[in-house]
């Protein structure tokens, strides 16, 4: 585990060196680095002059002794310009069709192809084989290609053309770039005099070929937990059910999972976490519509499902409804109920206290605490005589609030269930009950608090998992802040319910 954590620290350090001097390209560098570390491809979409080629050159320095190839495609580009010219000598002397590949795509680790959609069919077909199989057929031999990262770029998306669609599907990570937005970054760009093509990475940080190949074996061992698979499957169902949603091939899903495995590995984890799934927003979009749609779907999944937030919220709501109903039932059972008196000719309903109330001084608790005369009142203390006067004459009830001070008048009525009900100034009401039931109510409240505490512990456990899945180098910080806010909302819900139950 220590070795894995040291690796994570090395990758963080490497990324910081690669990002230096590039403004508002931090996330792009990190995603391209992740793609390079697991042998995937990247498509950069954006206008000219926004450092697309510089990003590709920077990634070369992530690897020790890596070779790079870059080329600007035109409608007239030929395979010779990408894969190397034909050997005249081999053709003349041996009759062999062989290319001289030194310095061209078949012999380089980092490849950048700009204006990729202008490539002709001959280039596209050979390029597809190179991406899929990492092999290049040169005459009568088939050579392995050392390519670790292919970055393609364009200022437009491919047209609806089958010949281009196949290549577009091979570009696993798709990044939509724009010019620098922040004033301070624009100022820093204009003021910088550094040579952007210099190597910013110390040799001891660069990745060796031995390390790269060993890591590929380790990446494949990273586990996809059932909980993360369920989220992925839910996202897949959402996309399938959405009108005009992007078509995502099984191959792309498979390669996306490999990218998530790499993310987990280089963040020092042995299994994919929900945070890694955020990377799917850069893998599954196809056009402007899906580019905007995927972050919305993933935001919902991260704040509701990733750490059981929605289930916990629903369970807390259910507990609140159960408690409310239990309180209502208990209040109806415990509430002081007057006895209805029947008179032969009287039209007005008359009431009296139950016979079992013999005390001259009474303490009556409120089922729902009210603010009366600027005091939060939990119980009232009054003379039995005063209560009888109110029952018979229907005037305001006179009682000491919380048993303190002089008696004060309280608005009160007898409700349809024949129960005395008192009101505050905003007409919020509460029925009353005798102290015999107070001990029972405290015990019941403790039971509800204990049930609530179990939810609190589960929230704490899920929050601990969230913290354990960090830091996550390849995920932007605003995603982490959004997930953190979902835990704050759950905790606030628990606190509010605790106050209600304890009041």
Swiss-Prot record:
Any single GO CC term annotated in Swiss-Prot or TrEMBL for this entry: cytoplasm
Disulfide bonds: none
Entry's EC annotation: 3.6.1.-
Keywords: ATP-binding, Chaperone, Cytoplasm, Hydrolase, Nucleotide-binding
Modulation of this protein's activity: ATPase activity is stimulated by ViaA.
Keyword Chaperone: yes
GO MF annotation: an example: ATP hydrolysis activity
Gene3D superfamilies, alphabetized: 1.20.58.1510, 2.40.128.430, P-loop containing nucleotide triphosphate hydrolases (3.40.50.300)
Chaperone keyword on record: yes
Catalytic reactions on record: ATP + H2O = ADP + phosphate + H(+)
Cross-referenced Pfam families: AAA_lid_8 (PF17868), ATPase_RavA_C (PF12592), bpMoxR (PF20030), LARA_dom (PF20265)
Localization of this protein: Cytoplasm
Binding site for ADP: 23, 49-54, 196
Listed InterPro entries: AAA+_ATPase, ATPase_RavA, ATPase_RavA_C, MoxR, P-loop_NTPase, RavA-like_AAA_lid, RavA_ATPases, RavA_LARA_dom
Subunit structure: Homohexamer. Interacts with ViaA.
Function: Component of the RavA-ViaA chaperone complex, which may act on the membrane to optimize the function of some of the respiratory chains. RavA functions as an ATPase.
Similarity remark: Belongs to the RavA family.
Protein name: Regulatory ATPase RavA
Biological classification of the source: Bacteria, Pseudomonadati, Pseudomonadota, Gammaproteobacteria, Enterobacterales
Gene from which this protein is expressed: ravA
């Amino acid at each position: 585990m220590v070795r894995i954590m040291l690796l994570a620290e090395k990758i963080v350090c490497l990324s910081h060196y690669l990002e230096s001097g590039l403004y508002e390209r931090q996330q792009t560098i990190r995603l391209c680095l992740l793609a390079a570390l697991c042998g995937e491809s990247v498509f950069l979409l954006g206008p000219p002059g926004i450092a697309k080629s510089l990003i590709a050159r920077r990634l070369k320095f992530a690897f020790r002794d890596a070779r790079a190839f870059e080329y600007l495609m035109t409608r007239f580009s030929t395979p010779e310009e990408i894969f190397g010219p034909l050997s005249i000598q081999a053709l003349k002397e041996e009759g062999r069709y062989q290319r001289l590949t030194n310095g061209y795509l078949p012999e380089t680790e980092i490849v950048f192809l700009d204006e990729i959609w202008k490539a002709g069919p001959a280039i596209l077909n050979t390029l597809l084989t190179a991406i899929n199989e990492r092999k290049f057929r040169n005459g009568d031999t088939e050579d392995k290609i050392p390519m670790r990262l292919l970055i393609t770029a364009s200022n437009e998306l491919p047209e609806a053309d089958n010949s281009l669609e196949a290549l577009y599907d091979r570009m696993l990570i798709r990044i939509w770039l724009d010019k620098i937005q922040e004033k301070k970054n624009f100022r820093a760009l204009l003021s910088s005099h550094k040579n952007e093509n210099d190597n910013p990475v110390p040799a001891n940080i660069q990745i060796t070929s031995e390390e790269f190949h060993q890591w590929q074996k380790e990446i494949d061992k990273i586990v996809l937990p059932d909980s993360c698979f369920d989220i992925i499957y839910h996202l897949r169902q959402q996309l399938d059910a959405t009108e005009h949603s992007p078509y995502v091939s099984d191959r792309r899903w498979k390669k996306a999972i490999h990218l998530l495995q790499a993310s987990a590995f280089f963040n020092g984890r042995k299994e994919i976490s929900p945070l890694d799934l955020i990377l799917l927003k850069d893998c599954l979009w196809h056009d402007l519509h899906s580019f905007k749609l995927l972050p919305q779907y993933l935001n919902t999944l991260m704040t509701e499902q990733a750490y059981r937030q929605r289930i916990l919220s629903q369970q807390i709501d259910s507990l609140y409804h159960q408690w409310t109903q239990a309180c209502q039932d208990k209040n109806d059972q415990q509430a002081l109920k007057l006895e209805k008196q029947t008179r032969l000719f009287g039209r007005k309903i008359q009431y009296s206290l139950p016979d079992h109330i013999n005390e001259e001084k009474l303490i009556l608790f409120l089922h729902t605490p009210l603010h009366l005369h600027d005091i939060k009142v939990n119980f009232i203390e009054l003379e039995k005589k005063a209560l009888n006067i109110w029952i018979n004459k229907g005037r305001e009830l006179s009682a000491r609030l919380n048993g303190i001070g002089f008696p004060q008048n309280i608005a009160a009525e007898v409700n349809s269930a024949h129960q005395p009900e008192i009101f505050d100034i905003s007409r919020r009401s509460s029925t009353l009950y005798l102290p015999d039931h107070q001990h029972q109510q405290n015990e019941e409240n403790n039971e509800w608090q204990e049930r609530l505490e179990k939810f609190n512990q589960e929230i704490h456990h899920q929050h601990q998992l969230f913290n354990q899945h960090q830091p996550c180098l390849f995920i932007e910080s605003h995603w982490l802040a959004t997930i953190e806010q979902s835990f704050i909302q759950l905790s606030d819900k628990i606190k509010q319910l605790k106050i209600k139950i304890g009041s």
